[in-house]
């Protein structure tokens, strides 16, 4: 029985792209984001023509809006169920498997995070500091709903933008620490940009024929 790979890291670091490469090489891919999109009806109904990711963002809204903490908790409960199901299926899979987690996997229960670490090979694709600066500037230009794990707190008369500018680097640093806690292996995200299947399999120490 194969020990499933578990890819963790910030959104946009390349987890999904690398998972798809493995999928074309015989691996069974468990895409947590896609699974969540298929179960969004429990949280929000997309408008006609609206992509699930935008419907989720519209529903969750920004961290300074009323009720955000409650909506975040509801979302994470859904992510918990989906991620646990993916892990169970990956463990039972005859074919080798890879679980493409969301960026907020580190906010799931300690029990599930420990189980991911125990039963899977957790690989953290690290976002370098230069990319974090770019992510911060992009987020400030076009803020999108993300899970903050209780970190977002405005001080005094801070505007939402001022609080976000102050706290976003802390969000990234906190996540970096939490990813490292569960990771068995850390790979610099840019290291695998543009990589093809043989090189990816070799870098991960995987058999070129997963059967």
Where on the chain are the PLM-derived regions?
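NTP-dependent small-molecule kinase module
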Residues: 2, 21, 25, 96, ...
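Hydrophobic anchor at the beta1->P-loop junction of P-loop NTPases
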Residues: 7
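P-loop (Walker A) phosphate-binding loop of NTP-binding proteins
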Residues: 10-13, 22
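Walker A/P-loop
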Residues: 16
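Conserved catalytic segments around the Walker B and adjacent sensor/switch elements
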Residues: 27-32
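ATP-dependent small-molecule kinase phosphotransfer cores
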Residues: 34-114
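Short glycine-rich anion-binding loops that position phosphate/pyrophosphate groups of nucleotides
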Residues: 103-106, 128-130, 192
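A glycine- and Lys/Arg-enriched "phosphate-lid" helix/loop adjacent to the NTP-binding pocket
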Residues: 118-176
């Amino acid at each position: 029985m194969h020990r499933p790979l578990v890819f963790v890291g910030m959104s946009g670091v390349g987890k999904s792209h690398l998972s798809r490469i493995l999928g074309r090489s015989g691996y069974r891919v468990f895409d947590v984001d896609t699974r969540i999109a298929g179960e969004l009806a429990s949280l929000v109904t997309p408008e006609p023509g609206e992509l699930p990711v935008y419907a989720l963002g519209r529903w969750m809204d920004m961290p300074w809006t009323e009720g955000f903490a409650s909506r975040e908790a509801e979302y994470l409960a859904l992510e918990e169920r989906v991620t646990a199901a993916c892990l169970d299926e990956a463990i039972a899979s005859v074919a080798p498997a890879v679980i493409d987690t969301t960026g907020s996997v580190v906010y799931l229960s300690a029990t599930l995070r420990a189980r991911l670490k125990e039963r899977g090979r957790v690989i953290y694709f690290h976002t370098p500091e230069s990319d974090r600066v770019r992510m911060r500037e992009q987020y400030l230009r076009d803020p999108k709903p993300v899970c903050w794990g209780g970190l977002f707190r405005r001080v005094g008369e801070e505007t939402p933008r001022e609080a976000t500018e102050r706290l976003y680097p802390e969000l990234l640093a906190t996540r970096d620490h939490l990813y490292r806690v569960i990771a068995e292996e850390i790979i610099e995200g840019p290291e695998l940009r543009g990589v093809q299947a043989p090189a990816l399999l070799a870098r991960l120490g995987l058999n070129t024929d997963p059967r």
